[in-house]
C-alpha cells in the first residue's frame, strides 16, 4: 500500500479532549489510517514517552505515524513522517537531515502550496476548511478554496479544519486524498464508534 492510501483517515491528538494513547488506540480500532502526535506545550521527554507508545500502536494497526513540527522527536520515536507549518523548519533542511521521512506541509493558499511542493513536501495539509476550536488562529479556506488547490496540486492533499461527520462528505467531494480530524474523533464521547462512523463515510469516496 502506498503512503497516499493511508492518508485517507488522519487523526490528530489533542490532550485537551482525551489522553493521547487511549484516544489513538480507539481511533485505530475504528479505522484511522494515519495518526499525528501534536503536543505543542509538552516537554521533549514527555513527547518521546507518548510517541514511543503511539509508534507501537500504529505499527500494530499498520497505520502511519507522524509527529507535528519536531524533527528530533520524530527521529527519536522512529516515526514515519513529520508535519510542518510555514514557520517551522524548512522542508529542504528536513530532507537533508532525515531523507527517509514522509514530510507533510500545511498550506492555506496556492502560494504556500507551491512553496511546499517546490521544497519537496510529500503531501499537503490544506485548511482550515471550516472554523475550528483546536486552532483558533487558523485562516478559513472554505470548500471553494480547497477545490482550487485540489485541482492544481501535484501531491496528495489532506483537508483539515472543523471537519466532522456532518460535513466530511462535502470535503471529500473536493477530490482530496484524505481528511484530518481532531475534535470529531478524540473529543467524542465514544471515540471508537465515532471513528467507525467516520471511516464508513470516508470509504464512500476513497477505497
UniProtKB/Swiss-Prot annotation:
Pathway: Cofactor biosynthesis; thiamine diphosphate biosynthesis; thiamine phosphate from 4-amino-2-methyl-5-diphosphomethylpyrimidine and 4-methyl-5-(2-phosphoethyl)-thiazole: step 1/1. It holds the Pfam family TMP-TENI. 2-[(2R,5Z)-2-carboxy-4-methylthiazol-5(2H)-ylidene]ethyl phosphate binds at residues 132-134, 162, 182-183. Binds 1 Mg(2+) ion per subunit. 4-amino-2-methyl-5-(diphosphooxymethyl)pyrimidine binds at residues 36-40, 68, 106, 135. Its EC number is 2.5.1.3. The keyword Metal-binding applies. Signal peptide: none annotated. It catalyses: 2-[(2R,5Z)-2-carboxy-4-methylthiazol-5(2H)-ylidene]ethyl phosphate + 4-amino-2-methyl-5-(diphosphooxymethyl)pyrimidine + 2 H(+) = thiamine phosphate + CO2 + diphosphate; 2-(2-carboxy-4-methylthiazol-5-yl)ethyl phosphate + 4-amino-2-methyl-5-(diphosphooxymethyl)pyrimidine + 2 H(+) = thiamine phosphate + CO2 + diphosphate; 4-methyl-5-(2-phosphooxyethyl)-thiazole + 4-amino-2-methyl-5-(diphosphooxymethyl)pyrimidine + H(+) = thiamine phosphate + diphosphate. GO terms for biological process: thiamine biosynthetic process; thiamine diphosphate biosynthetic process. One of its GO terms (molecular function) is thiamine-phosphate diphosphorylase activity. Mg(2+) binds at residues 69, 88. Keywords: Magnesium, Metal-binding, Thiamine biosynthesis, Transferase. Its cofactor is Mg(2+). GO terms for cellular component: cytoplasm. Condenses 4-methyl-5-(beta-hydroxyethyl)thiazole monophosphate (THZ-P) and 2-methyl-4-amino-5-hydroxymethyl pyrimidine pyrophosphate (HMP-PP) to form thiamine monophosphate (TMP). Belongs to the thiamine-phosphate synthase family. HAMAP family: TMP_synthase. This is Thiamine-phosphate synthase. It comes from Methanococcus maripaludis (strain C6 / ATCC BAA-1332). The gene is thiE.
Amino acid at each position: 500500500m502506498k503512503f497516499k492510501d493511508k492518508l485517507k483517515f488522519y487523526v490528530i491528538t489533542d490532550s485537551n479532549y482525551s489522553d493521547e494513547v487511549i484516544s489513538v488506540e480507539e481511533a485505530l480500532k475504528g479505522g484511522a489510517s494515519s495518526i499525528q502526535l501534536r503536543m505543542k506545550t509538552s516537554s521533549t521527554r514527555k513527547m518521546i514517552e507518548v510517541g514511543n507508545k503511539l509508534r507501537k500502536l500504529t505499527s500494530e494497526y499498520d497505520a502511519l505515524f507522524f509527529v507535528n513540527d519536531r524533527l528530533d522527536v520524530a527521529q527519536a520515536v522512529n516515526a514515519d513522517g513529520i508535519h510542518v507549518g510555514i514557520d517551522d523548519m524548512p522542508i529542504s533542511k528536513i530532507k537533508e537531515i532525515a531523507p527517509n521521512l514522509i514530510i507533510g506541509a500545511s498550506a492555506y493558499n496556492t502560494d504556500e502550496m507551491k512553496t511546499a511542493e517546490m521544497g519537496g513536501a510529500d503531501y499537503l495539509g490544506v485548511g482550515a476548511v471550516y472554523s475550528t476550536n483546536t486552532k483558533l488562529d487558523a485562516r478559513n479556506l472554505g470548500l471553494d478554496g480547497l477545490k482550487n488547490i485540489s485541482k492544481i496540486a501535484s501531491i496528495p492533499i489532506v483537508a483539515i479544519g472543523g471537519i466532522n461527520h456532518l460535513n466530511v462528505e462535502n470535503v471529500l467531494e473536493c477530490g482530496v486524498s484524505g481528511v484530518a480530524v481532531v475534535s470529531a474523533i478524540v473529543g467524542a464521547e465514544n471515540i471508537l464508534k465515532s471513528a467507525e462512523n467516520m471511516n464508513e463515510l470516508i470509504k464512500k469516496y476513497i477505497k
